């Protein structure tokens, strides 16, 4: 195994023995840090001095550990990546500049021109446009399954398929796919299952690795940061996929950029993470700022506390809205009648009571707009997982670029509202909704 050293390093304890709440604080801290600092240091540097020419050459051929350039790695970011990998139980993590950059980096390291990825129909609008526009221009075909039934995914897979892709909880519909069955289908075809686990809150609510996923992408901007103060994404390599099955010569084959180096033979079960870093970050430049990595580290220390509060607030808000005369429908996976409740209860903590819900109001689009514009406490933004309550109108924001037909496939209606409760007292959130309803229904 080559000596690349910017993955999980400086371990002073076995994280697998620790509970999530302990790992979110201790993982990624270097007990041997020479200053004795309790916190992680921020390294605002673009480059690093090489001790001699031989050392520099070794770094660039990936035969020795060390820092090269912050586009590839940074000590602050390395600490953050180690914490994320420990929370998920992955072999390595690669931080990126946004959730979208995590997706595009991961998928372009899996598929090439003329190959395809089979994906869920229930996707975040930005992801849908990435699939429909940018990846298509790169020659990568995205085959959207007609439903989330695993059998529909299976029918689209052929010898050119290089991954199966889904969200652990669809955005914005909150539908939960059968992750375990999708994993079985992907593995039968010899390809990895990639799960966007943004709604799974860094593995606290849902850890797809426990159910057969091979690669996880996550928008760290949401629950990982938790305060709307930083952008970031993350790719986590579960270390379980067999890259030597003949379908991935870009990983188990000679690397054009590294004089024929075979990443799988050199790096073993973390080969995909290495690929994302030394090819993906190098060529696409999707690296995060060390300042943002630091803010993600701070956010992670309170993640379980925040998410537990937000899940409970979501439950109480859903119960309030279900009985309100101004509300036509409430889509909340915590309700037994929700079509995804069974899957949510299987894959998510707290009996599947997720951190987001959707509602449709009585009336038309104008009524919906009036309600949103009348909110005083909740913010009208394209955000979830923030410390403040966020209400989003997907049809005019996150899914605006989609056609009406594509919106319908994604579960987005003209009057749908996505609600992500924050850390405020739930009684204040409900009071804000009540006064907005009164104004909207005048």
List the predicted regions and their residue ranges.
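Structural beta-strand/beta-sheet cores of well-ordered domains, especially the beta-sheet scaffolds
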Residues: 23, 40, 46, 191, ...
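Short, acidic Gly/Pro/Ser/Thr-rich loop/turn segments
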Residues: 32, 49-53, 242-243, 303, ...
